[in-house]
A protein has these predicted regions:
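Extended low-complexity, serine/threonine- and proline-enriched intrinsically disordered segments
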Residues: 41-59, 66
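Residue-level detector of short, conserved catalytic/binding motifs and their immediate flanks
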Residues: 28, 42, 78
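Contiguous beta-strand segments within globular domains
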Residues: 15-31
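Short beta-strands within extracellular/lumenal beta-sheet-rich domains
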Residues: 6-17
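Short, small-residue-biased leader/transition segments that mark boundaries at the very start
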Residues: 1-5
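Short loop/turn segments at connectors of secondary-structure elements within structured domains
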Residues: 24, 38-40
């Protein structure tokens, strides 16, 4: 395998699919298609726009990853949830946000696979839930 596959890829955004700034008072979902091309693992971590530090919340949860016991859809896809309200029966896939606090995510691929580079797997936009 090429040395490039031993690296990490970081993807980020400050806006949702509609072009609106990510807002801690709004609930969002990110639908990860099946077979995320990460030979080691993938992770999603949220950060505070003002401090650029890991997002603070009462639950002390700032990330989710493929190394966790997430709820996986029948087709192998995973829905990640961000917002002040936990999604019913999918709390394992939720990263809480705080109203009044802007945030941004880093989605990381550790040992990214070929499907990322040839764009046969594409990370969708975050959408309002």
């Amino acid at each position: 395998a090429s040395d490039v596959y031993k690296r990490q890829i970081y993807m980020s955004t400050y806006k949702d699919k509609d072009g609106d700034w990510l807002d801690g008072g709004v609930n969002y979902v990110l639908h990860l298609p099946p077979d995320v091309p990460a030979e080691s693992f993938w992770s999603m971590t949220l950060y505070d726009v003002d401090t650029r530090c890991i997002i603070g919340n009462e639950q002390h949860i700032a990330d989710r990853s493929s190394r966790m016991d997430l709820v996986v859809n029948e087709d192998g896809s995973v829905d990640l949830y961000f917002g002040p309200d936990a999604p019913a029966s999918k709390e394992a896939n939720w990263i809480p946000t705080v109203a009044g606090k802007a945030w941004f995510p880093y989605f990381r691929l550790y040992s990214p696979g070929k499907a990322f580079f040839d764009k046969t797997w594409v990370l969708p936009d975050i959408e309002k839930a």
